């Protein structure tokens, strides 16, 4: 096999007259009046190859037998295309290769779908034949971008003096967060390793060890219900530092992300990124990861409507809730009564009992609840919401968390439906000043908002075991276009504070020691102040590549039900394997 001289997609007018050797796949073959044209594809693109009997009759005869997706080697000379034959859609469209020789390296069955961009095929089939799906240029380009992003992160962290240190994949199962994937031990029957949800504790121990600056591009595993931007295994850019403030960690993160966007998209992002407290994000956007590319902010109108004779509003306020509204500017004409009823059904998915609405027409409020607003209250509401003719006013009344969840989701939906989002914009945002705990309604207790190793704000440490709801965290999330792409914090580095944290979470001293004794021991040996952040590589690439599903950025992903159609994982194992592990499966009873 002759050595390749060029990739197909690299050929241009500078190569005219040169002899080249190309390897690739047959994208398309056309027989036109004694000439055969083959579009040859490799990872860099497509080039047209011409087989002319006057130039090589033998090559033409072989080319006549090839079919789509055959793997071939072609030797020939680069020529300029005629002016009428130029293909502006191809990067190589001004040249073609006149073939002298062709060698068929391997044949191909007819693929189950065309290997081209924009092909209409189910996700299930794409994943079953993922090796074919990945041949498509748009998929190839995503993984080129992923490589660029990963390389840029590595180069930046290396330049900043970070050490790339691996941590184990077989670790100890610990509570909090998502369910663990468990791995049975053959040597110790009845005992299990866990695949890490993150290297959190181990990277903290590396700070105790004195490494000062650590990073790792690491696989993480979480057995949780899936959605479009989640996978059971994913990759994060994980870093930890000692002796730095959270502002310094944020600055490092911004430097990395600015470099990544420049390398991957050739877009310059301004620093520093905007900052917003958790409370402000929830108040204004109804989300702890707000998309700030568009408006439609939530506005609290409780004071305006508290005296309005509308029982839904009155009841919510009397029960400690609130009334908030979104003013969809100039959108009234876009929504019929049926459309507005559908929005009511939509917000019900987020706990709302309904969606009240008003339209502004000829200076007056119109709609089912307009009758509850006397002239003075109508005027006050219009001022509060800066409402004008043509505006659509949407209201939710309930407990604060339900109002935030329902209107926050509605805001995102309206942003898309009304085409308010500039899809080319990249809007980074820091969300800071998080509560240390959040209340779990099902468990009827407070749980960690991030993880149990997050440092409380110093002034709140005395409240850990007495008034958990008021404790704030030294935590910070980084958001991009409405997606959380990273979370970080300063960490607890003193044993007594960590013990207090565990007690606040409901651990007994005995259970804390059983689960985290090794960490508690380490905190007694001069652990320095430290903190870090973990960035979701898959999600960052997804956003930069303009995709809406993580599956497109992972070479061999799972479906929404955590199944791999390519390998049929997960699958059953043999009785012999189970016996070796001292395991038995529980058979489901069938009626």
Swiss-Prot record:
Gene3D superfamilies, sorted: Bira Bifunctional Protein, Domain 2, GAD-like domain, Nucleic acid-binding proteins
Catalysed transformations (reactions): tRNA(Asp) + L-aspartate + ATP = L-aspartyl-tRNA(Asp) + AMP + diphosphate
GO molecular function, one term: ATP binding
Residues holding ATP: 222-224, 231, 484, 536-539
UniProt similarity note: Belongs to the class-II aminoacyl-tRNA synthetase family. Type 1 subfamily.
Protein function: Catalyzes the attachment of L-aspartate to tRNA(Asp) in a two-step reaction: L-aspartate is first activated by ATP to form Asp-AMP and then transferred to the acceptor end of tRNA(Asp).
UniProt name for this protein: Aspartate--tRNA ligase
Organism listed in the record: Listeria monocytogenes serovar 1/2a (strain ATCC BAA-679 / EGD-e)
């Amino acid at each position: 096999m002759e050595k390749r001289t060029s990739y197909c997609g690299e050929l241009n007018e500078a190569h005219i007259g040169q002899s080249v050797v190309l390897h690739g796949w047959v994208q398309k073959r056309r027989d036109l009046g004694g000439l055969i044209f083959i579009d040859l594809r490799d990872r860099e693109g497509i080039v047209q190859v011409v087989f002319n009997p006057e130039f090589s009759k033998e090559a033409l005869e072989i080319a006549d037998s090839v079919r789509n997706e055959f793997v071939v080697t072609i030797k020939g000379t680069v020529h300029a295309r005629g002016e009428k034959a130029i293909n502006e859609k191809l990067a190589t469209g001004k040249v073609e290769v006149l073939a002298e020789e062709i060698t068929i390296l391997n044949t191909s069955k007819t693929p189950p779908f065309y290997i081209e961009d924009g092909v209409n095929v189910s996700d299930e089939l794409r994943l079953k034949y993922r090796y074919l799906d990945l041949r498509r240029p748009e998929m190839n380009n995503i993984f080129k971008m992923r490589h660029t992003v990963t390389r840029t992160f590595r180069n930046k962290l290396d330049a900043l003096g970070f050490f790339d240190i691996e941590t184990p994949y077989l670790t100890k199962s610990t509570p909090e967060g998502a369910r663990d994937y468990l791995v049975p031990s053959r040597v110790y029957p009845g005992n299990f390793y866990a695949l890490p949800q993150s290297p959190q504790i181990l990277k903290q121990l590396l700070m105790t060890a004195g490494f000062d600056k650590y990073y790792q591009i690491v696989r993480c595993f979480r057995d949780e219900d899936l959605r479009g931007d989640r996978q059971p295994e994913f990759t994060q850019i994980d870093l930890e530092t000692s002796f730095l403030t959270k502002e310094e960690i944020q600055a490092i993160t911004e430097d990395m992300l600015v470099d990544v966007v420049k390398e991957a998209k050739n877009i310059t992002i301004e620093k520093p990124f905007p900052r917003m407290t958790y409370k402000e994000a929830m108040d204004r956007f109804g989300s702890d990861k707000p998309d700030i590319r568009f408006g439609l902010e939530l506005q609290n109108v409780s004071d305006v409507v508290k005296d309005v004779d509308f029982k839904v509003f009155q009841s919510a306020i009397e029960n400690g809730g609130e009334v908030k509204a979104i003013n969809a500017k100039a959108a009234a004409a876009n929504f019929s009564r049926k459309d507005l009823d559908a929005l009511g059904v939509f917000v019900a998915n987020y706990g709302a009992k309904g969606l009240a609405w008003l339209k502004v027409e000829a200076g007056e409020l119109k709609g089912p609840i307009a009758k509850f607003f006397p002239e003075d209250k109508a005027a006050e509401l219009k001022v509060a919401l800066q409402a004008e003719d043509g505006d659509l006013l949407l209201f939710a009344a309930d407990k604060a968390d339900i109002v935030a969840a329902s209107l926050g989701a509605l805001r995102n939906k309206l942003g898309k439906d009304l085409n308010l989002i500039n899809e080319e914009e990249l809007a980074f945002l820091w969300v800071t000043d998080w509560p240390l705990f959040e209340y779990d309604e099902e468990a009827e207790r407070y749980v960690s908002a991030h993880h149990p190793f997050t440092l409380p704000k110093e002034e709140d440490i005395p409240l850990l075991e007495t008034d958990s709801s008021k404790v704030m965290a030294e935590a910070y999330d980084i958001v991009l276009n409405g997606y959380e792409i990273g979370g970080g914090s300063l960490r607890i580095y003193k044993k007594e504070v960590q013990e207090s944290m565990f007690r606040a979470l409901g651990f007994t001293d005995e259970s804390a020691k059983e689960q985290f004794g090794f960490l508690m021991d380490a905190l007694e040996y001069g652990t320095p102040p430290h903190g870090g952040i973990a960035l979701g590589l898959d999600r960052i690439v997804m956003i930069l590549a303009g995709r809406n599903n993580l599956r497109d950025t992972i070479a061999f992903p799972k479906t929404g039900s955590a199944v791999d159609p390519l390998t049929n994982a997960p699958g059953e194992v043999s009785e012999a394997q189970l016996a070796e592990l001292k395991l038995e499966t529980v058979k489901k009873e069938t009626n």
